[in-house]
Amino acid sequence: MAFIITPHINNLHGGILTPIIYQHIITGIIAPHGITDLSHSIQENKVKELLSIYSITNIGSFCISQFNDNIKLLLDISFLSLSIIHFRHDMPVINNIPKYLWSFLLLYISIIYSYDIFMLYMCLSHVPKHYLTNWKYIKKNKWFNIILITTTTILCYLLGNNYLDLIINNIFYLNIVKSIVISHIIYQELYILN
């Protein structure tokens, strides 16, 4: 998630992965995985809750973005803090070190040293685990979910590959993306991973 704070896709400091590979990973793998929230909300009669979370988060993000830079920082702090909370589910238990610490270190090291670490984590751990965790909801209505996930992936990929620079370089669009991610995390934490 830390990639969203970076102002331009070409400024992402990596190692092996190039900006174009980042772009394809973000738009084709990472961005669409949250659509399973919609499937879950339909099956579990939580559509109202899902829409409330997304509405409140988007409106709140918009309101925050109207203030000075110190207040705007609240959105980034919320974004990173909730990412740490969310990613803890993927972290190992090693020597009683809290999963939150591993999650924090993942983001910190990715931001400071190389976004390749984060991209590989998302591709090889988080997104596959996300689908695995949500498989019980996906398999209940396979065709609906195949169509939903495929359509979302195609849309994210096409929009992202055509407009990613615009999104990343426009604070309004960037805040919308952050609020969508925050909404996904809140919904997952409250209704799926609780």
Name each model-derived stretch:
Residues 21-30, 72-85, 116-129, 171-180:
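Hydrophobic core segments of alpha-helical transmembrane domains in multi-pass membrane proteins
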Residues 1-29, 177:
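N-terminal signal-anchor module of multipass membrane proteins
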Residues 105-140:
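Generic multipass alpha-helical transmembrane bundles of integral membrane proteins
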Residues 32-43, 81-94, 128-136, 183-194:
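C-terminal ends of transmembrane helices
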Residues 24-45, 52-61:
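Membrane helical hairpin/interfacial module
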